[in-house]
């Protein structure tokens, strides 16, 4: 291109003096360089960083951000193709290979698909790409498995066999409110309103909501708090000094051990949440109210808890068909 500038200057030599020709050449070179700067293409890593920043601003939890990041990083490292050149065929092949190599369930692969789809949809919305390659890759069909809940008898067994006031209070609060274990361990004593039997929890994306507990839970919570000798503001703390805030893993381990000791199948915090939701729906609570209590943004998520109890089906059949 510099040769063309020289050619222009030479053609103007007949009408311009030396000083003017020199100035013309400077102006042409300057403007040419400014207007023809080649923009450096955005790297795949940079696209991912922009996406993660956007999700952070939207209020996604640290756990969700980490899952997005690890999922998409793995995909980009395996594909080794600039994002703008990634096609639907490439993505299908990646998902097939992922399932074969890891021998994972269809549910796991669909979770991966959903995360990657969110990434490309965001790129499309932000005009970084023309069309998401995930548009034609639909939800992977999985087997509909009816997940078990904790029976009334099992709940009473768990209560009766708690070795500490803390564990009894945890079981009552989980069963009564249906809160997530992550919400449980973040609770402070100050969050509990004993008069109204309610508390404020911070759910996914730090969304605040109000949940309610029964009289039995109120009694056991008070007994546990009154028995403590520490000054920690946390509602639930470790059993021994220095009495740190209880962690998610601590709750999970404690419940799992108690369940095994009683020969109960798969006792974990989320099972109490599922049980509470199922019981509420069975007793006639409107699904919209259950959604509010559980803190679901989509009612479809709540509908997954509307498990049809086979015993109830049998009773209804005997009632109407006998």
What are these regions (language model features)?
Residues 172, 176, 273-296:
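C-terminal catalytic core of tyrosine-transesterase DNA break-rejoin enzymes
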Residues 214-264:
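Active-site/catalytic core of tyrosine-dependent DNA strand-transfer enzymes
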Residues 177, 186-220:
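Conserved tyrosine-mediated DNA breakage-rejoining catalytic core shared by Y-recombinases
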Residues 129, 144, 152-181, 205-207:
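Basic, Lys/Arg- and aromatic-enriched nucleic-acid-binding interface segment
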Residues 22-30, 211, 223, 307-322:
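DNA/chromatin major-groove-contacting recognition/catalytic segments
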Residues 73, 117, 168-182, 198-199, ...:
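Short pre-functional
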Residues 30-39, 46-146, 227:
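N-terminal core-binding DNA-recognition domain of tyrosine recombinases/integrases
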Residues 38, 149, 204-205, 294, ...:
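Catalytic-site neighborhood detector that most strongly recognizes the C-terminal catalytic loop/helix
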């Amino acid at each position: 291109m510099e040769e063309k500038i020289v050619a222009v200057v030479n053609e103007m030599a007949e009408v311009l003096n030396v000083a003017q020709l020199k100035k013309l050449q400077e102006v042409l070179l300057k403007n040419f360089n400014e207007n023809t700067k080649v923009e450096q293409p955005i790297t795949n890593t940079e696209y991912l960083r922009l996406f993660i920043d956007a999700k952070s601003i939207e209020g996604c939890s640290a756990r969700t951000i980490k899952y997005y990041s690890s999922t998409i990083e793995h995909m980009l490292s395996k594909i080794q193709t600039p994002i703008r050149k990634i096609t639907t065929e490439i993505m299908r092949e990646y998902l097939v290979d992922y399932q074969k190599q890891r021998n994972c369930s269809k549910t796991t692969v669909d979770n991966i698909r959903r995360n990657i789809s969110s990434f490309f949809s965001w790129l499309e919305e932000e005009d970084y790409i023309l069309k998401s390659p995930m548009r034609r890759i639909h939800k992977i069909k999985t087997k509909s498995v009816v997940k078990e809940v904790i029976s009334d008898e099992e709940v009473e067994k768990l209560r009766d066999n708690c070795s500490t006031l803390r564990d009894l209070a945890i079981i009552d609060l989980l069963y009564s409110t249906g809160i997530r274990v992550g919400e449980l361990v973040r609770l402070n004593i100050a969050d509990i309103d004993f008069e109204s039997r309610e508390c404020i929890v911070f759910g996914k994306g730090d969304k605040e909501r109000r949940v309610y507990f029964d009289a039995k839970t109120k009694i056991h919570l008070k007994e546990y708090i009154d028995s403590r000798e520490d000054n920690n503001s946390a509602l639930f703390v470790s059993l021994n000094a220095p009495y740190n805030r209880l962690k998610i893993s601590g709750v999970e381990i404690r419940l799992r051990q108690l369940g095994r000791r009683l020969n109960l199948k798969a006792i974990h915090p989320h099972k109490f949440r599922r049980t509470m939701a199922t019981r509420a729906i069975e007793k006639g609570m409107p699904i919209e109210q259950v959604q509010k209590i559980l803190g679901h943004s989509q009612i479809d998520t709540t509908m997954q808890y509307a498990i049809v109890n086979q015993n109830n089906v049998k009773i209804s059949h005997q009632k109407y068909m006998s």
